[in-house]
């Protein structure tokens, strides 16, 4: 039984974008295989949202910069006495491999953007009920095709995202592991601290307290206000302990 709930909050725009991309790709895979209209619309809606995120900024450039930054951090750690140099060298090799893979890949989302079925469904998703069979006969026929054929098509779409997912998974994993959780205490539901140039806040709260955080701030300073899930009858303890990692 789950006893704690984890919250993650970005402290800059690049991290906000990366977390959204991670979430959307997870959602794309959540209802696979695509076997009916419900799972199809769930899949295509998240594909469309992902393409919208790609169009708002140069995600690949930001990821390549982060790969370089992580390599520099590993290089500085390699000079610390007693560190596992073999592990550091292995991580640096993985970072270089992902950098090469990402640089060699086509523009992010280009294959998905040019696919006729994805483009047609994406256009209709903004219309309430706009994906009926009379609106999208192509989708209707596709959903009536053998499951094996749809699986091949969906897997080919997902494969075009592999350079991105491999890179993003490693970057987020390194960032999340960069700082341990430490016990903190809020007073009257409020807590603030310096960000120390962190990219990401991670909070673990006891589920039984039925609280959630409202977080504001940036990499230099942040503030957290805890709110009761039940806005009418819930209350926030005068002193509330939680776990916090500034990554």
UniProtKB/Swiss-Prot annotation:
Return the Pfam families for the record. Answer: ZapD
Any single GO BP term: FtsZ-dependent cytokinesis
Answer whether the UniProt record assigns the keyword Cell division to this protein. Answer: yes
Q: Which UniProt keywords apply?
A: Cell cycle, Cell division, Cytoplasm, Septation
Give the UniProt subcellular location, in the record's own words: Cytoplasm
**GO cellular component, as recorded:** cell division site; cytoplasm
Q: Which HAMAP family match?
A: ZapD
NCBIfam families in alphabetical order = PRK05287.1-1, PRK05287.1-3
Q: Could you describe the subunit structure of this protein?
A: Interacts with FtsZ.
Tell me its family: Belongs to the ZapD family.
PANTHER family, per the entry: CELL DIVISION PROTEIN ZAPD
Instruction: Briefly state the protein's biological role.
Output: Cell division factor that enhances FtsZ-ring assembly. Directly interacts with FtsZ and promotes bundling of FtsZ protofilaments, with a reduction in FtsZ GTPase activity.
The protein depicted here goes by the name Cell division protein ZapD
| Species whose genome carries this gene | Cronobacter sakazakii (strain ATCC BAA-894) (Enterobacter sakazakii)
């Amino acid at each position: 039984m789950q006893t704690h709930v984890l919250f993650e909050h970005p402290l800059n725009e690049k991290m906000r974008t990366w977390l959204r991309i991670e979430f959307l790709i997870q959602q794309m895979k959540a209802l696979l295989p695509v076997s009916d209209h419900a799972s199809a619309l769930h899949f295509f809606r998240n594909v469309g949202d992902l393409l919208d995120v790609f169009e708002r900024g140069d995600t690949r450039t930001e990821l390549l910069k982060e790969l370089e930054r992580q390599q520099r951090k590993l290089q500085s750690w390699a000079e610390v006495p007693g560190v596992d140099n073999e592990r550091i060298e292995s991580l640096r090799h993985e970072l270089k491999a992902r950098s090469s893979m990402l640089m060699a890949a086509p523009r992010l989302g280009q294959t998905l953007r040019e696919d006729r079925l994805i483009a047609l469904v994406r256009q209709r998703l903004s219309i309430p009920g706009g994906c009926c069979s009379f609106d999208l006969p192509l989708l209707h026929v596709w959903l009536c095709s053998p499951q094996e054929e749809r699986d091949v098509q969906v897997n080919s779409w997902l494969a075009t995202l592999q350079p991105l997912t491999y890179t993003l998974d490693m970057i987020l994993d390194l960032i999340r592991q960069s700082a341990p959780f430490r016990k903190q205490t809020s007073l009257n539901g409020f807590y603030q601290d310096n960000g120390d140039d962190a990219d990401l806040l991670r909070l673990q709260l006891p589920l039984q307290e039925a609280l959630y955080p409202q977080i504001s701030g940036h990499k230099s300073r942040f503030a957290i206000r805890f709110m009761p899930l039940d806005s009418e009858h819930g209350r926030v303890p005068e002193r509330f302990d939680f776990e916090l990692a500034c990554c």
